[in-house]
Amino acid sequence: MKFPEIYSATGMMELIQQIGFLPLLDSGIEGFSAEDIVAEDCGYVRLPEGGWDWPLWKWKGEIVQEMPCMYGKFFNKKAGFISQEWWPDFCNYRRSKYPRPDEESIEGAILCTLQSTGSLITRELRAACGFTGKGMRSKFDSYLTRLEMATYIVTEDFIYPRDKHNHKYGWGWSLLNTPEDLYGREACQCNRTPEESYQRIFKHLKEILPDASDIQIIKLIG
């Protein structure tokens, strides 16, 4: 499938709705990422006066909020989008591989904290879970990534600091939540077996990525 060149957040939303799955950056499959299909002037650029501009990066919050869709580190520990149509199957398969963590485990404690507090930006959740010492940030991020890969945590939105002129700046912080809290338990329920969900996803990805090898697609599904 040849993907259209994308010039706007609206165009990206339409494509995600059409194909169901879209990694943000390099996916390991040539041409299959949001970065690959945006128009050249929507890519990352350094500004002459300092700073940077990256329209694609700024679209993420709009896409997640307005579609809506799921966003998180779903693809080989890298971020991407999944439409609500395909989320139940993806969730069904991934959770069969990664059962809900025990509440006594670190990952279980992180998930319970987020469920009890509601949405939190990453640093707030990290502090609430006691990961405040030296070197704790990277350790905490690895636990978060595992929970995102397992579909228990997603990004609800992106929060940006503002300068004295009330302009947003920086890379932004992920506002984290559980998919159940955002869209209800039914959004994560599927009437197929995990194997049936896997085969359905595999067949779909083969259709939209005819040049990708089976190994590449298997790696993408996880």
Residue spans for each PLM region:
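Long, low-complexity intrinsically disordered regions
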Residues: M1-G222
